[in-house]
Amino acid sequence: MSANEIPDELWRKILEIGVKSSTFSYKDLCCISISSRRLFRLSCDDSLWDLLLVHDFPNHIVSASSSSESPTKFIYMTRFEREKERKLAAHRRALLRKESEISEWGRRIRELEARLSDEAERLQSSSLQFSDLLKVRQASVALNVWQPEVVRGRQKQMVEQNAVPVEGRLRALEMEMKLCKQQIMGLNRALREVKHRYDIAIKELESMKYHPLRDYKSIRNGDQGSNGKTKKLKTSINYSGDQVSNGKRRKLKTSIDCKFMNISHFSSCSSVTEKFYSYSPKIIHEYIPENLLVL
């Protein structure tokens, strides 16, 4: 029994059961509709699209006036476009939020790097002052040993000029150097953490912007460009050969490519058709009497 001999009621029942069991989606119905005019007419039935509308958009309420004026397939398409626009808008908002987060992490990194540079300069200045004071103290100790009278007079003059003694300044500079080192350690730790979060946000943004079809097309375009250069090089190398045999080879290759393109053109519909016809015998044996099947 061929597919053309099956009555419309049975085809309609097959499509209805497929939609109810979630075996057929709106994509499958669209692929089935382009296989023949008969299936196009059956797949546009309002009862099938009513089931899909309830299943895919359970929160959508269809008014009686709109359902009577326009077919259910048009209502489903309108609702699908609205849902698609809503998802695209939500995706754009998520991208903007992620980009704002990345810019905030970048600003935080620049701020920490500036503070780290200031602390490093402060530490260097304190260490230079500390080393100068150490040299002064060592020189004063040596002079006190070899020329005590001169040192006493010089120290008396320095004490009168400076209110803070050398030992106190050394301790203050030492504490300031320790504080600078602690600040640098904390800033380095915070900078590593912020950079780690910045890298994570960059990867998340790349994954959010990833589009398989667009990226695949860009890759294929690059491959085609390189393949074109390779083909040109091979053609220039083999041009000195027999031109007649090359023409025959090109014709044979063109015919093979055309056959391959015709086969690949129907490969997308063949999977849906195979699923459709593999699903239909179960319904046929269930709803058609055995005597008709024998015929």
UniProtKB/Swiss-Prot annotation:
Q: In which pathway does it act?
A: Protein modification; protein ubiquitination
This chain belongs to the protein called F-box protein SKIP24
The UniProt keywords, alphabetically, are:
Coiled coil, Ubl conjugation pathway
From the UniProt record, list the coiled-coil ranges: 82-129, 167-209
Q: Record's InterPro entries?
A: F-box-like_dom_sf (IPR036047)
Residue numbers spanned by region Disordered: 217-245
- Naturally occurring in which organism (per UniProt): Arabidopsis thaliana
One of the protein's GO biological processes: protein ubiquitination
Query: What GO CC annotations are associated with the protein?
Result: nucleus; plasma membrane
User: For the F-box domain, which residue ranges apply?
Assistant: 19-66
Could you confirm whether the keyword Coiled coil appears in this record? Answer: yes
What is this protein's function per UniProt?
A: Component of SCF(ASK-cullin-F-box) E3 ubiquitin ligase complexes, which may mediate the ubiquitination and subsequent proteasomal degradation of target proteins.
Q: How does it assemble?
A: Part of a SCF (ASK-cullin-F-box) protein ligase complex. Interacts with SKP1A/ASK1 and SPK1B/ASK2.
**Record text about domains:** The F-box is necessary for the interaction with ASK proteins.
Q: Where is the composition biased (Polar residues)?
A: 235-245
